[in-house]
């Protein structure tokens, strides 16, 4: 167990979780009642198996913890809780945090600098979040810090490090890699044309395959209308991997909303 040199608050395991309130966020509104029930069951197991640790004065409560657990379990709704094996703690800062980052250049020199991070997924360790950005994960904007870090964990199940290719059948690897790199190139072309700030997909997706998979996983669950029509082949691969189709959920929800409005006239 990691020992941290500052006082931390851990969420207790005997909470009466406010699931109805926790589900009441735009990210989860399109789930069916059956999906919500299964998501709650997974989230309860998640909270039994993982420690949520609040750092640097941040305070956890039952609603925050329940929402964090629900979002953690959304990507593995159809995969199973065992896909989140391999870590035991979620560390939560109140805001983006500073870490020492090291890298090796082309001639073998090691450089170090302090950088600000929103979150991290360690290969053999915890997921680290910050609450400021986690709150922005509740909407349907395409940004979701929790799903981003979970995607890295799912990616790392396929090897020692994140590669952008999760654990999929070997016969599908070449096609996945081709479609992922095509998406990266397309995103980079848009960045070159309009700039990072105006790009319709987070520019971080163009940096490397692992980040592309993580960023597009954010869009897959929280903004499918931006992902599916732009990269239809890759979208289908994501649907096959996650065994979910958020775009279909969106269409069904919209149709039910239209029907409800017509019934009121």
Swiss-Prot record:
Q: What's in the GO CC field?
A: cytosol
EC number per UniProt: 3.4.11.-
Which sequence ranges are marked TM in the entry? Answer: none
A GO term (biological process) for this protein? proteolysis
Superkingdom field? Bacteria
Give this protein's Gene Ontology molecular function annotations: aminopeptidase activity; metallopeptidase activity; zinc ion binding
Asked if Oxidoreductase is a keyword of the record, the answer is no
Q: Which UniProt keywords apply?
A: Aminopeptidase, Cytoplasm, Hydrolase, Metal-binding, Metalloprotease, Protease, Zinc
On cofactor binding, the record's note says: Binds 1 zinc ion per subunit.
Q: Which cofactors are named for this entry? A: Zn(2+)
Residues binding Zn(2+) are 111, 148, 152, 211
Where would you find this protein in the cell? Cytoplasm
The UniProt entry lists the main location of this chain as: cytoplasm
Q: To which protein family does this belong?
A: Belongs to the MtfA family.
What quaternary structure, including any partners, is listed in this protein's UniProt entry?
Interacts with Mlc.
Chain's role: Involved in the modulation of the activity of the glucose-phosphotransferase system (glucose-PTS). Interacts with the transcriptional repressor Mlc, preventing its interaction with DNA and leading to the modulation of expression of genes regulated by Mlc, including ptsG, which encodes the PTS system glucose-specific EIICB component.
Give the matching PANTHER family: MTFA PEPTIDASE, PROTEIN MTFA
Q: What is this protein's record name?
A: Mlc titration factor A
Q: Which organism is it from?
A: Salmonella typhi
Q: Read off the lineage from the record.
A: Bacteria, Pseudomonadati, Pseudomonadota, Gammaproteobacteria, Enterobacterales
Gene name on record? mtfA
């Amino acid at each position: 167990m990691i020992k941290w040199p500052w006082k931390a608050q851990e969420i207790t395991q005997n909470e009466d979780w406010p699931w109805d309130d926790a589900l009441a966020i735009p990210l989860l509104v399109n789930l069916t009642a059956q999906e919500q029930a299964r998501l709650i069951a997974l989230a309860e197991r998640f909270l039994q198996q993982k420690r949520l640790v609040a750092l640097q004065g941040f305070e956890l409560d039952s609603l925050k913890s329940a929402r964090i657990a629900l979002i953690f379990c959304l990507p593995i709704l159809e995969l199973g809780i065992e896909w989140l094996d391999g870590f035991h703690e979620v560390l939560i800062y109140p805001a983006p945090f500073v870490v020492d980052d090291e890298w090796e250049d082309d001639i073998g020199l090691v450089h170090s600098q302090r950088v600000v991070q929103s979150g991290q997924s360690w290969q053999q360790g915890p997921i680290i979040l910050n609450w400021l950005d986690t709150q922005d994960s509740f909407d349907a904007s395409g940004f979701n810090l929790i799903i981003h870090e979970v995607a890295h964990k799912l990616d790392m199940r396929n090897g020692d490090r994140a590669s952008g290719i999760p654990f999929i059948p070997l016969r599908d690897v070449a096609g996945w890699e081709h479609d992922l790199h095509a998406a990266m190139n397309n995103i980079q072309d848009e960045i070159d044309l309009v700039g990072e700030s105006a790009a319709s997909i987070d520019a971080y997706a163009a940096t490397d395959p692992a980040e592309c998979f993580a960023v597009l996983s954010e869009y897959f669950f929280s903004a499918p209308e931006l992902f599916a029509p732009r990269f239809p082949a890759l979208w289908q691969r994501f649907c096959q991997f996650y065994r979910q189709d958020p775009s279909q959920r969106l269409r069904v929800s919209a149709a039910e909303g239209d029907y409800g409005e017509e019934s009121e006239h």
